A protein has these predicted regions:
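Catalytic His-Asp segment of secreted/periplasmic serine-dependent ester chemistry enzymes
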Residues: 1-110
Length: 110
């Protein structure tokens, strides 16, 4: 996650996203634009609060990371659940016939 000096989330996957949309159009495949939707979520959280979604651990907070962890790439459980919720909601929007098969579990707040 990268924010600019004004606190706006940066788009860091432009070329990849463009390629995804190109293939989507070429083969008529629906796309869940998780790049944009995750940026929207991060922007709503803001620079400091968005850290709650990532592997940001203080020293001795987790036995696997005794020195702590400052990872702004990989989601923690809460962040992964938020991303999964976005995907599931978009599946419902793109493929309504699948909606009855999707169960949205509440996000754990720890």
């Amino acid at each position: 996650m990268k924010f600019d000096k004004q606190g706006n989330i940066q788009e860091t996957h432009k070329e990849y996203s463009a390629a995804v949309w190109e293939v989507s159009k070429q083969y008529n495949i629906p796309v869940i634009d998780l790049d944009k939707m995750s940026r929207d979520l991060l922007q709503k959280f803001g620079k400091e609060n968005s850290k709650l979604l990532f592997m940001q651990l203080d020293s001795l907070q987790h036995p696997n990371y005794p020195a702590g962890q400052k990872d702004n790439t990989h989601f923690n459980e809460y962040g992964a659940r938020r991303m999964a919720q976005i995907v599931l909601m978009e599946i419902k929007n793109l493929k309504p016939e699948l909606a009855e098969r999707i169960i949205i579990a509440p996000v754990k707040k720890s």
